Amino acid sequence: MSKGNINVSVENIFPLIKKFLYSDHEIFLRELISNASDATLKLKHLTNIGEAKVEYGNPKIEVKINKEDKTLHIIDQGIGMTADEVEKYINQVAFSGAEEFINQHKDADGIIGHFGLGFYSAFMVADKVELITKSYKDEPAAHWTCDGSPEFTLEKADKTDRGTEIILHIAEDSKEFLEEWKINELLHKYNKFMPIPIKFGTKKETLPLPEDAAEDAKPEEIEVDNIINNTQPAWTKSPSELTDEDYLAFYRELYPMQFEEPLFHIHLNVDYPFNLTGILFFPKLGNNINLDKDRIQLYQNQVFVTDEVNGIVPDFLMLLRGVIDSPDIPLNVSRSYLQADGAVKKISAHITKKVADKMSSLITQNREDYEKKWNDIKAVSYTHLRAHETLRY
């Protein structure tokens, strides 16, 4: 077993992380699951290019609660780490393995991590963290432990299956994160569209009866994994793959309490000069414009970031609903706040142009239908849209 000090630029970074880095402690789960997703996508990429001589299979991420031990477990079946990689990526705060991986493999789409601090968000809710990991390479597993001080222990582990398990020993002031309802709520808030299946417990599923079943036959119930996320949401698909019913179903998935159908949708899909995907809906407003609920949601590589999209979406389009997903929108280190730059202005101008184009096509194709919808869409000034449409990017 080896011991050492975590390489940080201050004597103890953990109180700073807990107090200043993240505005909301609950996002630790988003960060840890994002890391697990990264590890799995890295393995997929390496197997695709022949660098990893292992079977990718159908990996998933599992989240488990152990109330008796007061622990929360996040388990992936991804790339794993060797002891040397744990030293490099875990013990050097702010050195991001995902960022280095992207630089080495420019075509590795979907890698989320940027700052290398996400793992340490665990210490916002845990007074001890364990990491047990086995690399896809033929090397021994490693077991890293830290109690929130700069000191850590690193020893061999008897783990035989590929991947990483993170064990959070939940602190007394964070016991709510040992409640199933709370973890379920957070998973659905931040991770419901992540690209890797996420298992949280099990559920009962009823099998259909065979055609020749007796009249008094009872259907069989089986226990299956409770997968909480949709790994292929509508905005990740090509418009040619989707029907109007698919778009409506996605709207209902985003806003289950909205009973009115949207008036129209706009599918965003750009890869130059910036990356932007998403689907925006123009809701039926009626006489009640409530801009505080059911807002546009911002994602980065299918990870929810915020629904505060001021700056990306112009003020006069904030009544739209839907999803925007872009890795090119700069965020602060905690991924909580937008940082305005040239890319954001270009994306904002593009969104405005797409809305203007859609409204123009509605007038051209079916003016009568457009006039019927006027009471709902007049809140967006057509003149205002056209003025913004002239912005160049």
Task: Identify the residue ranges that each predicted region occupies.
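Short beta-strand elements
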Residues: 280-286
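Glycine/threonine-rich ATP-lid/beta-loop region of ATP-binding domains
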Residues: 111-113, 138-147, 151, 155-278, ...
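Short, charged, low-complexity patches
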Residues: 87, 309-317, 344, 348
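GHKL (Bergerat-fold) ATPase N-terminal catalytic module, capturing the glycine-rich phosphate-binding loop
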Residues: 1-177, 185, 192, 205
